[in-house]
């Protein structure tokens, strides 16, 4: 119910003695002033009867949860101008929408493909606040009031949180250069991913409604093998392209949407369906391994067979020759 004009006029024109009356009345209520026969006696020398009644009514309204409203604030308290407050509300609404989108797209991860328009909107609102000059002096401009006026800096914290989340998700890898739409490679990968999941669902045996309820997945492994191999090959190509484009930044990833989609597919294929894709390079790898293993044996065997076998010749020592010749001389002399 809206207050009448008389009450509104009385609130807008509060007498100057009212703060003093409230202070004394609160002191009496808290026991700071001595009690007499009645509270009127305490204020008899300070306030008239009518003024005292007004103080009592106002004190009761404050104790019951009422307040003085904006009139209780100092008249020189700085406040935002309408244009700056509108910028703050725009940023608040955009932040709320982006936060809801991020939470709803957490599992399965769809952050980049679902929330990129809202992220661009938040970035735009933050740029508007940073560039706002306000209608007052430079020291109290809109940007300074919203971004640097207090220790918490809530607007700055929210903006940094959104930017950090976007960078860690590497959503720029899923978008075009101007970040206005999904890239062609991302759209193609997501289409193959949806096609592979559709193949899984159509080839499940039985009437189960969930991927995790059936036990026989032979039809899934047989009929969806090509779809899975195509998706896996495309993912490997995207990884190689990303590594070539980011040579100066090792450890970069694809966007979180693509990585999570591939992880889901591999988990279903390997763990849930227990399928396996035979490697076409198995035979050449085994042949090369066996050849390298027996190469030393072949080398030493061929060396032994083709080397010249020389007979051993006994060579007598020189001392033995001299002693033999000396013995012959003695025999001849005798």
From Swiss-Prot:
Highest taxon, organism lineage: Eukaryota
Gene Ontology, cellular component aspect: chloride channel complex; cytosol; lysosomal membrane
Keywords on record: Glycoprotein, Lysosome, Membrane, Osteopetrosis, Phosphoprotein, Signal, Transmembrane, Transmembrane helix
Topological category with respect to the lipid bilayer: Single-pass type I membrane protein
Glycosylation sites (chain numbering): 93, 128, 135, 163, 177, 184, 194, 216, 263, 274
Subcellular location: Lysosome membrane
Classification via InterPro entries: Osteopetrosis-assoc_TM_1
Intervals, Cytoplasmic compartment: 306-334
List of residues that carry Phosphoserine: 322, 325, 333
Example GO biological process: transepithelial chloride transport
Keyword Transit peptide: no
Lumenal face of the membrane: 32-284
Post-translational modifications: Undergoes proteolytic cleavage in the luminal domain, the cleaved fragments might be linked by disulfide bonds with the remnant of the protein. Highly N-glycosylated.
Transmembrane portions of the chain: 285-305
Main location: membrane
Signal peptide coordinates: 1-31
Quaternary data: Chloride channel 7 are heteromers of alpha (CLCN7) and beta (OSTM1) subunits.
Function: Required for osteoclast and melanocyte maturation and function.
Family statement drawn from the similarity comment of this UniProt entry: Belongs to the OSTM1 family.
Disease link: Osteopetrosis, autosomal recessive 5: A rare genetic disease characterized by abnormally dense bone, due to defective resorption of immature bone. Osteopetrosis occurs in two forms: a severe autosomal recessive form occurring in utero, infancy, or childhood, and a benign autosomal dominant form occurring in adolescence or adulthood. Recessive osteopetrosis commonly manifests in early infancy with macrocephaly, feeding difficulties, evolving blindness and deafness, bone marrow failure, severe anemia, and hepatosplenomegaly.
Name the record gives this protein: Osteopetrosis-associated transmembrane protein 1
Species whose genome carries this gene: Homo sapiens (Human)
